[in-house]
Amino acid sequence: MLAQSFASSFAVERSFFSASFDALLQSPDAYLAVASRNGRVIGYLLGFDHRAFFANGRVAWVEEIMVAEDMRRLGAGSLLMASIEEWSRGRQTKLIALATRRAADFYRSLGYEESATYFRRLL
């Protein structure tokens, strides 16, 4: 399960994953995108948006983004990020934020800037 590759502190439980997946699909504030190649899921992005006073509007948050290690640097991550940007623009979101300890250069290459301990891109 690709989500297990993301988790470093917790083991992803299949039953919780299944229940969460169904709930996320029903949530109007959740965004889930999947990247595939030749019928194989090679990446996913899970994000949300919400209202925030500091932004004078909606803020999107990339909660999880993962691309299979053997499929990195082929454009899947960029496409996943572009997809949440498009979704966010359609919802009049003001910015997208995420926190990461890895891949800072990747996010910078997409136009995100370091802000405190997270990256953001004004939309």
Q: Which residues fall in each region the model found?
A:
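Active-site beta-strand termini and strand-to-loop segments that position acidic
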Residues: S36-N38, R121-L122
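A short helix-loop-beta-strand connector motif used in the catalytic cores of GNAT acetyltransferases and
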Residues: D22-V34, W61
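Conserved acetyl-CoA pyrophosphate-binding loop and the N-cap/start of the following alpha-helix
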Residues: M71, G75-S83
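Short amphipathic alpha-helix that is part of the acyltransferase structural core
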Residues: M1-F16
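Conserved beta-strand in the GNAT
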Residues: V34, R40-D49, M66
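Conserved acetyl-CoA binding element of GNAT-fold acetyltransferases
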Residues: N56-E69, T117-R120
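Conserved active-site alpha-helix within GNAT-family acetyltransferase domains
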Residues: S78, G90, K94-I96, T100-L123
